[in-house]
Amino acid sequence: MVTPVQGLGHTLQMQVVEATPERVVMTMPVTAQHLQPWGYLHGGASVALAETAATAGAFLNCPAGMVAFGQEINANHLRSVREGLLTATAIPLHIGRTSQVWEIDIRNEQQKRICVSRCTLAVIKSDAPGATK
């Protein structure tokens, strides 16, 4: 299953490869629109990929009528990238009633880790479309 993502994820060309409550795998190509002025992957693009993967997994763990919103995210950028396909793998560290914490590992096509991130999400009640599973 490869599924495109909406919103910012769509703009950055992210795709969902796997999505379960225990693990989310997403990809994002590195193209000119993902680069900072010096020709390397913009750190914000990595963080957007990390939070998108964590949010997808968190939503799969939310009860009906609840959604997950990013509350805090950190990222360590370990290796620079100029092109290629990135793969983010998000796994839950904590699934609570009102919060979740996810760890996201982002690797390049050579399976070298380029970024590691941790994202905390608030679980809140919502009447937004799509909040009911």
Regions found by a protein language model. Give the residues of each.
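Terminal targeting signals and extreme-terminal segments of soluble enzymes
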Residues: M1-K133
